[in-house]
Amino acid sequence: MTDPTPPPPHSSRPRRGIYLLPNLFTTGAMFAGFYAIVAAIAGHFTDAAIAVFIAGLLDGMDGRIARLTKTQSEFGVQYDSLSDLVSFGLAPALVLYTWSLQYLRYFGVLWGKLGWAAAFLYAACAALRLARFNTQVGVADKRYFQGLASPAAAGLCMSFVWTMENAQIEGAWLCFFTPILAVIAGLLMVSRVRYFSFKAWPRGDRVPFVWIVLAVLLIVALVLNTAAVLLIIAVLYVLSGPVMTLWGLRSRLSRRRLRAQRRQSPPPHE
């Protein structure tokens, strides 16, 4: 009786390829950002703002899907950053420029340069924010973002555009305010101001009943006036960073004063 043919040796080379499901969501987010650029060029600014918010939803889902399906990869991390640059860096900058900033050129050459410079500053700060985030993935405290996250900055700018469009206020009328908005949002992205990341938010734990009531009220408000409610939420979140940072600084200074007083006070006599 002859011995059976031995099975072929397994290849030691790693399998090449990418995970499909999470990268499909990342591609969808990039497409939404690209569509926002096209819509803004065509003058459909409400559609452009909505597209950026859709990109934000898809961007928030790809990472969670990758963790749930255990399909995380370095390729996905880098691809997600490139998608974020398009959707939350270039797209909002171009929407702001075509909607409002371009009209500064009618006030002179210098003002026109200020318009595109503000748009570029926003896009550049988004790129720097994403690069810094990638280098601090394994080091930074996951409970907080260092600087305003690019989706939040895009949400602030796009909810403002969306709200003004619903109110029939043209961007040309706000061309002196829009660069201030773009610069503030851009600088907050590269700042060291801490923002709550919601990554440590309890998911499986029970929550107070009042939270359910607040969630229902929020949904009703979003249905009644989506753009205005999103703008209010974005403004409150943007303001929370400086407030939380100043509060933390005040607490640290108070602790330092207390320690200094303890060192200076004489020891009690026996």
Predicted feature locations:
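Topogenic membrane-insertion module of multi-pass membrane proteins
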Residues: 1-60, 244, 268-270
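C-terminal membrane-associated helical module and adjoining short loops/tails
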Residues: 1-10, 142-270
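Short juxtamembrane and helix-loop transition motifs at transmembrane-helix boundaries
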Residues: 7-17, 41-47, 76, 107-116, ...
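Multi-pass membrane catalytic core of lipid/isoprenoid biosynthesis enzymes
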Residues: 21-26, 68-130, 160
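Active-site His/Glu-centered metal-binding helix of metallohydrolases
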Residues: 31, 57, 61, 65, ...
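Alpha-helical transmembrane segments of polytopic integral membrane proteins
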Residues: 34-37, 54, 58, 92, ...
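Helix-coil boundary and interhelical linker segments in multi-pass alpha-helical membrane proteins
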Residues: 35-50, 93-117, 160-177, 223-228
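Hydrophobic, well-structured mid-protein blocks that either form specific transmembrane helices
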Residues: 116-155
